[in-house]
Amino acid sequence: MRQTITLACAETGERLYLTSKNKRNTPEKLQLKKYSPKLRRRALFTEVK
């Protein structure tokens, strides 16, 4: 079952992106590189509750 998760920037802490993932297939926390408007560059975003 897919669940909606929030992605937060590792450097600034801002929560900008929503995505979904299947927790059965990927139990570890998701990490994606996304654009951060505050930093004006791509940064690492990690899954938060």
UniProtKB/Swiss-Prot annotation:
It comes from the Bacteria. Keywords: Ribonucleoprotein, Ribosomal protein. One of its GO terms (biological process) is translation. InterPro entries: Ribosomal_bL33, Ribosomal_bL33_CS, Ribosomal_bL33_sf, Ribosomal_zn-bd. One of its GO terms (molecular function) is structural constituent of ribosome. Pfam families: Ribosomal_L33 (PF00471). One of its GO terms (cellular component) is ribosome. Belongs to the bacterial ribosomal protein bL33 family. PANTHER family: 50S RIBOSOMAL PROTEIN L33, CHLOROPLASTIC, LARGE RIBOSOMAL SUBUNIT PROTEIN BL33C. This is Large ribosomal subunit protein bL33D. It comes from Enterococcus faecalis (strain ATCC 700802 / V583). The gene is rpmG4.
